[in-house]
Amino acid sequence: MQDKLIIRGARAHNLKNIDVEIPRDKLIVMTGLSGSGKSSLAFDTIYAEGQRRYVESLSAYARQFLGNMDKPDVDSIDGLSPAISIDQKTTSKNPRSTVGTVTEINDYLRLLYARVGIPYCKNGHGAITASSVEQIVDQVLILPERTRMQILAPVVRRKKGQHKAVFDRIQKDGYVRVRIDGDIMDVAEVPELSKNKMHNIEVVVDRLVQKDGIRGRLFDSIEAALHLGDGYVIIDTMDDHELIFSEHYSCPVCGFTVPELEPRLFSFNAPFGSCPTCDGLGIKLEVDLDLVIPDENKTLREGTLAPWNPISSNYYPQLLEQAMNAFGVDMDKPWKDLSDEDKKLVLHGSGDTAFHFHYQNDFGGVRDIDIPFEGIISNISRRYHETNSDFTRNVMRSYMNELPCATCHGYRLNDQALSVRVGGKEGLNIGQVSELSIADHLSLLTHLELSENEKTIATPIVKEIKDRLTFLNNVGLNYLTLSRSAGTLSGGESQRIRLATQIGSNLSGVLYILDEPSIGLHQRDNDRLISSLKKMRDLGNTLIVVEHDEDTMMAADWLVDVGPGAGALGGEIVASGTPRQVAKNKKSITGQYLSGKKKIPVPLDRRKGSGRFIEIKGAAENNLQNINVKFPLGKFIAVTGVSGSGKSTLVNSILKKVIAQKLNRNSEKPGKYKSISGIEHIDRLIDIDQSPIGRTPRSNPATYTGVFDDIRDLFAQTNEAKIRGYKKGRFSFNVKGGRCEACSGDGIIKIEMHFLPDVYVPCEVCHGTRYNSETLEVHYKDKNIAEILNMTVNDAAEFFAPIPKIARKIRTIKDVGLGYVTLGQPATTLSGGEAQRMKLASELHKRSTGKSFYILDEPTTGLHTDDIARLLKVLERFVDDGNTVLVIEHNLDVIKTADHIIDLGPEGGVGGGQVIATGTPEQVAEMTESYTGQYLKGRLNEK
């Protein structure tokens, strides 16, 4: 087999017909500036060709179900193995997909509970066991010699009635004696029973004395009793001691029954095991009392019930007042002071009790009717489910939230599945185990108490579970729970979960391609991730990792630096060799950072800020432990901490949502907190995330930043446009007039090929320009509108330099390091990091008030160290204008430049949620209990 992967003539996107040779069975890191062509080489060339070759080996029938498999623009690739891509874009948004299902740990857990689990009565009557006739006989024969016993078959258990038909059947079957409510009597002499009382009726099947030779008779009698008693038998030893057995998993006291234990019982995705109320989702859309009653200090008359405020109609205020008067509820007493009974009436209604309602509308219409009072919760729920109006449904939805299911308490399973425990009476059910962190789950399995027989069955299953949990632990995900919904995971988390699954598969000879697996990972956990990558390599696999992390680059066997610049300035192999060889390469920007010749400097001094704060008290959402946090304004703030320590919960779930509620009247409910102060010191909240700037190819940098409006104005003012009577709209590709109607302004035509991938070809009429020929005849400085859109930002900045209004907006795109993109580049082709910087550019050209609050969650995702240096200059411009910038970040180059650090921890999950350190980077670096401080110290010493 070849020992090299040889790529010849790669031209995908901006790649410039490159040739590169990469060693097989090694850990290879591909790096370079954002937009340099790393992903084009790794994913769009190497992985795409690996996938295409596999799919081509399938039948035409199978290929039609596998989607598009375009042949990448490359001359040849030799030495290619089957390829598996683990990127950040394929996170499942299915609410049924959890960490447990994605990693397949749930499959093994279900098997474990089906094989060694013991059901316990949900009503507290102890363990429920199922016994065969043979097992029951064996247990009875253990009784002491000469023990007198009678074998009873329970035919009626705690049921009202006279049960005459039961006695008739007993007599027909030839039985003589029965026990009724504890008293033995002949069937023929049974008195008439009270039909309003609960009764227990047992048939006396046999009477025996314990001695040698009774096994055969005992077996027959117990078998007959089980048949008569619907699977139950009672052994009465005549000394007030009874043994109750069942051949089903059924509680002998209350009758709670569990079906035969099999894996499907423990699946929330199967009707057999899922909770019947929430269908296995664990959540239900319910009316949220906090949204219905936002202020408990208000009275009913003052409008404490938000949905029934008299904004558009006086119907509900009239209904409420007349109902409250009828039922004697004080309309002028604050909600918090009303009795529980009065609150219940307001919320849930009066049941069947009616009151007289007289209603007159604004047009004079009168309604007199006796009706029950519905209650506001029932009213919202009914209107949400019954209305045909989208507007009404959306209004009602704004008072509802996805809350844990009241039946299964969020565990997703039915009572029968949740009654089964592993590890004895004090053991946990499968729902409780799924709520444990990975670290706690590992500890539980290590100390699991099982009988010798159970150990024999469970050992191979437990090994598989522990192996997978250990892999998750080793890639820094020890804080996650198996019940965590896959849709709530970050890109880095979901990628590392799939990475752990691949390690568990123990495949060899595979080509793995990973996209920044270190995203969201604290420096402390990075070593474990690198060890996991090396373990995959040592199994005989080739790993190509697109990465910017310095530690990962230095741990690689081979480093490929793509560049030298981004976009049209990139697409070449600048350096290819060992990390040490690349570090010595003077042409490589990556090499200069690795060797220390280039670095992001530590600021000489820190900003003092405005002296004002936003302070949150009592933050207690998720794992936050009732903490108080101050965010100083007018500073560059970094919120840090190990993965899972509570950073995103504090910033995204509480701070951001509370500010949005107060400033923007956002209805999204924030996480738990007691109070917040200082919001009056800011006037804008800007959340700059990595979501796309547009969902369609029609959105592009020019339209997003607004510069396209100015460019169209400019074209409309040209002499040619005035002569022809063209207005600004003529130069839009979104509306009829100036656009090409053959492709509706898209510039491309989609051709469906059925068994082959859909093909996109340039429009034959406009040749991809998007405009009709008449529009393209209008020129500004010898360029038509299509040629302007095809310009890179760098070229456009020079071209429009004499026009300040346009030049200023284009310069901001250049300032954030996106000079290589074209003005008309479709938004769908921009990476997350590029989209985030485009949003920053859009903010840069707006006039600053000096009171804005910017939030960025891991802005360094996808950025090279050189890109980070540019990003920091942009963020510093915001702060220098008096604004506040808050970043959630693990990158030490960003953290060391911050004015103020808030470090959470000490660990992830339940071991986190505390404020470990606050202050300048220098102050945090001196705090030994801070993991961030320990790593920061080394970076600060590089001054």
Curated annotation (Swiss-Prot):
A family per Pfam: ABC_tran
Entry GO MF terms: ATP binding; ATP hydrolysis activity; DNA binding; excinuclease ABC activity; zinc ion binding
UniProt record, GO biological process: nucleotide-excision repair; SOS response
Transmembrane segments: none
SMART domains attached to this UniProt entry: AAA (SM00382)
Domain ABC transporter: 308-589, 609-937
GO CC, alphabetical: cytoplasm; excinuclease repair complex
Residues annotated to bind ATP: 32-39, 641-648
InterPro entries: AAA+_ATPase, ABC_transporter-like_ATP-bd, ABC_transporter-like_CS, ATP_grasp_subdomain_1, P-loop_NTPase, UvrA, UvrA_DNA-bd, UvrA_inter
Location relative to the cell: Cytoplasm
Keywords: ATP-binding, Cytoplasm, DNA damage, DNA excision, DNA repair, DNA-binding, Excision nuclease, Metal-binding, Nucleotide-binding, Repeat, SOS response, Zinc, Zinc-finger
Taxonomic superkingdom: Bacteria
Zn finger (C4-type) location: 251-278, 740-766
Gene3D superfamilies per record: ABC transporter ATPase domain-like (1.10.8.280), ABC transporter ATPase like domain (1.20.1580.10), ATP-grasp fold, A domain (3.30.1490.20), P-loop containing nucleotide triphosphate hydrolases (3.40.50.300)
Record's subunit section: Forms a heterotetramer with UvrB during the search for lesions.
Function: The UvrABC repair system catalyzes the recognition and processing of DNA lesions. UvrA is an ATPase and a DNA-binding protein. A damage recognition complex composed of 2 UvrA and 2 UvrB subunits scans DNA for abnormalities. When the presence of a lesion has been verified by UvrB, the UvrA molecules dissociate.
Family membership: Belongs to the ABC transporter superfamily. UvrA family.
HAMAP family: UvrA (MF_00205)
Protein's name according to its UniProt entry: UvrABC system protein A
UniProt organism field: Streptococcus mutans serotype c (strain ATCC 700610 / UA159)
